[in-house]
Amino acid sequence: MKTLQAMGIPYNPDFNGAHQFGVGFMQHTIDWKTRRRSSAVDAFLAPVMSDPLLTVETEATVTSIRMDRDRAIGVDCIRKGSRKSASAGEIILAAGAYQTPKLLMISGVGPDDELTKHNIQKKVVLPGVGKNLQDHYECPVVATTKGAFGYYGADRGWPMIKAGLQYLMFKTGPVSTTGVETCAFYDPDGNNDRPTIQMFCVPTVYLDRDVMGTEPGDGVTINSLLLRPRARGSVTLASSDPFENPIVDTQIFGHPDDLRPTIAGFRFARTVLEASPMRELINKEIFPGADVTSDEALAAHCKRTVKTGYHPVGTCKMGQDSDPEAVLDTSLRVRGTRGLRVVDASLMPTIVSGNTNAAVMAAAGKAAGLILA
């Protein structure tokens, strides 16, 4: 944070406030009093678990939505090897941007060609199901540090015991955090009213996918994440088997305008490592290496190491009647059906320029009002 502020990036105490531009502490779903994770389950489900009107079935896989022509009347599932069915006046899907379109398609709601290809009985032909996939994608720059300034090694041996005791006694230390503590939102082209890059810092050598030649150790990893991708991917069926995962075509860098800001974001992350006071802590850049400087070399690095930011959205998008690929109406009802809604990240027409957690909770809150109306 101090380095970015020295570079002219202002401190921002609330990325969800009036302005997104700036550097600040990551906003987490952590209860600051107990220093424990406070998820949607804690906030919304736990308080009503004893309600006799609520039944929660875990370890269950929904195999299909039961349809009577165009009306959804229930779901079939398998739980611990046993087949079960549940019926309701309205069915609400919340399986996420990958599984919700899969469930719709294996139940006969989706693009004509997909249903025909997998010999699925057509209930409602809806071309937009599985289209419009968007995500945030990130690329890393990694450097070793001159000392043990981060969290490397805190998950084993005496450091792990020490971290556990520190948390139990004081609710501080590595166990009280996600490990991603600071981030910044900015635009490489200077349009900071509308940031296009989110940059976040992990205080260790961190790569959560196989990248040859880089070992964990004391260091720092800065990831640059593209907030407004232009490319659109898709989710299609591998088969009609409900237990088989769908085919996810991300189309990362499938639009020519996506690679340039990603490279610009990477270059900026590298300048952070080279600026004071950060540079006093840095030993050397180890990935991709200080000799990787040309646009061509950086493009190759980004294409090789790019990974998901775990924010997939858009595959059952909400839209106007005039949009042929709109899956949901403005009340989140699946077009062409009755008694069927979608309430998850797949409803977003365009991905939000930040983490999707709060946006999905906000959409769910709005959906609750629509359902009860």
Per-range role (PLM):
Residues M1-H28, K146, G164-A359, A367-A373:
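FAD-dependent oxidoreductase catalytic-site/capping-region signature
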Residues M1-A72, D76-I78, P140-G164:
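Conserved redox-cofactor binding core of oxidoreductases
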Residues T63-S64, Y98-T100, P324, P349:
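Glycine-rich nucleotide phosphate-binding loop and flanking beta-alpha elements
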Residues T58-A60, V124-L126, Q320:
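Short loop/edge segments at beta-strand edges and connector loops
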